Amino acid sequence: SPYPDREELVAMPALHLDVALIHMNRADSCGNGQFLGPDLFFDDLYCMAADRRFMSCEKIVPTEELLREGSIHTLKINRMMVDGVVEAPGGAHFTECPPDYGRDEAFQKEYAATARDPEAWEAFRARYLEVGSEREYQEAVKSR
């Protein structure tokens, strides 16, 4: 260890990702992505580690609007780091995308509970995951 406590540290090669899927608060159509919450959640690192990178966002805005809601430091994803952008409001559900929305704890608990039971998992999949579109998924989530 390079530290005074001589703790034994382990090093390993970085994982190589085929594809990274990230979600940001705002983006422009060129692939510049902005986070408005307190934590970037390593999305920039995922993009740098992957061969192909796709970004969903709460809202696609004109490039000049990206700095209206946050400083230059909130632009952590640049257009050279992504291969595609899609607007997907609620796309980080059931996790959070602050300040747009927080974590859906009730849904996360439902997910965790059903994952333990094959029959419950099948019902969960049918209700939420095997729907035809993102809109249908969001409607199923709101209907609970």
Regions found by a protein language model. Name each.
Residues 1-144:
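Conserved phosphate- and dinucleotide-binding cores of soluble alpha/beta proteins
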